[in-house]
Curated annotation (Swiss-Prot):
Keywords: Amidation, Neuropeptide, Secreted. Disulfide bonds: none annotated. GO terms for molecular function: neuropeptide hormone activity. Myoactive. This is Pyrokinin-5a. It comes from Pycnoscelus surinamensis. The keyword Secreted applies. Belongs to the pyrokinin family. It comes from the Eukaryota. The keyword Secreted applies.
Length: 17
């Protein structure tokens, strides 16, 4: 959950949060 899709919980969250 960060800026790009990667985690799965957010639409634009990935390698940051």
């Amino acid at each position: 959950g960060g800026e790009t899709s990667g985690e799965g919980k957010g639409m634009w969250f990935g390698p940051r949060l």
